[in-house]
Amino acid sequence: MKKLIFTETSKNPPIKNPKKHLHLVFFILSLAFFLFILYQGLFLPYALSGPHGKEQGAEHQALQPFDLVVKDAQKLEGMFTLYRNKATEKVYLEIKPQQLTKKFLCFVTLASGLGEAGILSGMPIGDFLFQLRRVQNTVQFVIPNINFRTSPGDPQAGSVERAFSESILYSLPVKSIHPQRQTLLIDLGDLLISEQRDLPGVKSILPMLLGASYSIDADKSYFKDVKAFPLNVEIASVYGFSSENDSSVNYLPSVPDSRAFNLRIHYSFSEVPLNNGYRPRLADERVGYFLTAYKDFSDNISREPFVRYINRWHLQKQIPTAPMSPPVQPIVFWIENNVPLEYRNAIREGVLMWNKAFAKAGFTEAIQVKQMPDNAKWDPADVRYNTIRWSSSFEPEFAGIGPSRTNPLTGEILDADILLDANIVRQVKQNYRSLVEQNRSLARSFQGQNGSNTNPCQFGMYSRYLKVLENGDLKTGSSEASPGGIADDLPTLVERYQQQKRSSLSQLLASSDMCFGLEASRQFAIGAMSLSLLENATPSSQNLEDYVNQYIRFLTVHEVGHTLGLRHNFHGSTMLQPEDLNNTQLTRTQGLVASVMDYVPINLAPAGSVQGDYFSALVGPYDDWAIEYGYKVIGGGLNPRGELPALQQIASRAGEAQLAYAPDEDTVDDLDPAANAFDLSGNMLRYSQWQLENSKTMWKRLEKRTPFGEDGYNELRVMFDSVFGYYFQQVMNTTLYVGGQSFSRIRPVDAKGKLPFVPIELAQQREALATLEKYVFAPDAFSFAPELLNKLAPSRWEHWGSPALVFPLDYPIGDRITFLQRFVLRVLLSPARLARLRDAELKSAPENALKLPEVLNTVQKDVWKEVLQPTNKKMEISTFRRSLQREHLAILIGMVLRKTNVPEDARSLAWYELRQLREGLSKSIRNLDRRADTYTRAHLEETRDRISKVLNSQIQSN
């Protein structure tokens, strides 16, 4: 070892014998290293976690004393302790040290609304899990990332935590620290009524909903109600909103001044339920439940990285070993005290209908119904109460909606509230005036007259088919842009649809899968109208009252199903054959449908038949089966996988016809005609034919109807138009058979010999084409008495909320018919359907496939019947027929010129059909009588010339 050398200027004396002191040097170095490690492991985190000792005293001097801050404030003790000073409008929240980093739930509800644009009282607007975390002199409001998880003790936990970020929404200043309890005090106004912080995100969605930006005004915002309970805290804040630019504000008829309005928002804070005996239940795609899903990084065995739990209530038997037992804690629904007295019983019956299904799962009286007292002190938005609320709106957004709130870690349902729109009854009680508003609202959405209208249900039945047209070449249409109403030109219609479906409200309701769409309201109105037209029932008759109660009962049972965790099942309406639908001996023992979770239309018997129940009075066999899967008590400990054998045994019945399941995503591409909304029976094609005839009968009855009262002609107009919409729906249901396939969510062991996909029988596809020819494309498909059309006068009131119809003033019958025909033709010959027809030839035996040549040739013969199937009569092509033929011509030309992305075989066939048509046109022109009308001659000659130019032109490429 080298000697230690010191300079002469060093004040330290040299060590004469370094080896002698080597052990001392080693001891000093070891002690220093030990103290450094001890400081890092123990004292440093403690120092960083908050001020202590002198630093703490200094900070306490910087902050106001705790008692001074809460002086004169009312103390509310509960899960969190609150201090409310009504004089200063301050509310403080006290956070205990053990509550930091603990997980809590926040449920946010719109307690008051605007009555339009989806801003409705009772709407859920936010549910999330959060933590409160202290960092220096602030408290962070943190949304942890629970989408990625590991098992307890897994060393991968740190890696997962570093890989995926959490969301720190806000950092709130600490106002004071209690000197003994070491609790932190924050101003709750910094979180809930701040101009800068918008916890529920209302401010961000207002531009989408209202078409203008609004800011939160702190001077107009305040706390309304503040309550603390041992397990939850309930707070209601009133937000004052003002427009950011008064010149850009859209007119809101439900608000006195569109530049400013208030919204009351209710917050429910509660602890995340832990160790309460609840066992999550694994999901199965054959049974329809809402899901709670996460990715498990600790599971290296399963093929599927996701763990999926169904959302369900925590039901336990009082007597665990008994085959039938009441639950320890039943599911209780409270009917809000503002529900009209005459409808409370129908709502009660709708809720209790589910007890039949729970009985098959081993529970008696699993669901109970109570009436909210008129003098109740609790708020319907309180997380401790499940309520059924009566929602009033200026413009109806839905008939009903049934959201539920869950524990996002386990899927346990903790709270549910159902909203029923009061307009569902006014449609009958006020002589269909609400249908007038629906039609105006629909027209506004199509014409773009109200940019703020983003109702996702506004397109009703059209939304399912508009997406089919999105990839089509609509710019090459017939150029007959219709100027009003639902007969707007197709390119504009599709553009509006694309804008609407991107709105925040649309995404909310689509993702929640809970909106019983506005089309349900139209179905209800059609049923009431059919009673008036087919059975001469008056709005005050007992028959109509029974009908209203049947509808409310069915609407309620559907929404309660959502709150139990069930998703839609659009296969649910196919259980009975059309001939059995009105056999009450059958429907009142088995049910009218297999599942009340379908969007079921009114059951209208064909003319001359006995009318049965309009809506199902029972939950169906699928509903019983789904509740059994979700709620049957199964042994196996607390590990969810212990239930798998029993659950798979239940789900293996999926191959049974009555248990077929099709949620929203199975209806997206219009593959399966049985997976459909507002269809009925196991033979929808025949049922649609019945309803088309019912529609024609109602039109005939309108011709003979004598209008009465001040609104007589307007009522006649609305009824006529509503029947038109009903007719349209039946036609569109028919199109689903062409190129269709049935799809079943089955596994190989569920149904021997049955495959997931089965092409629709060739005979049914041909019958569908024949039905479209008869009711849409035939020259005599639409025929109305001129006297009836001249009675269809609109209401002429002009004031807020009731703008007078300006254009077109007379009923646009030509636009209505033209729009229907063009729409059906575009959907029938869409690129997606043509591609499916091409592929169907590979999926069927040659003799069982509906081939592209047959479809294109059949449609062309139907549309150009006067040319290709001439008679001895003088040729006269009506204006409707000419418009339809121009649309068909435009579609074929688009294919030939590669303006649409159709299969190459379809393009070649379109070229061939144009040549055939040109030959027919030339022959017809030669044989035209000299006295033929000029319209027909000009139409035929122009069409022939257009075809020649296309066939002779150089093919253009995209």
What residue spans do the PLM features occupy?
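Bacterial N-terminal signal peptides
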Residues: 28-41
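Auxiliary tRNA-acceptor-end handling modules of aminoacyl-tRNA synthetases
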Residues: 50-339, 357, 361, 366, ...
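N-terminal secretory signal peptides that target proteins for export/translocation
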Residues: 1-21
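Signal peptide processing junction and immediate N-terminal pro/mature segment
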Residues: 41-53
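Conserved catalytic/binding loops enriched for acidic/polar residues
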Residues: 488-503, 509-519, 525-526, 530-531, ...
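Soluble non-cytosolic domains of exported or imported proteins
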Residues: 123, 304, 337, 341-349, ...
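The catalytic-center signature of Zn2+-dependent metalloproteases
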Residues: 360, 370-393, 397, 550-606
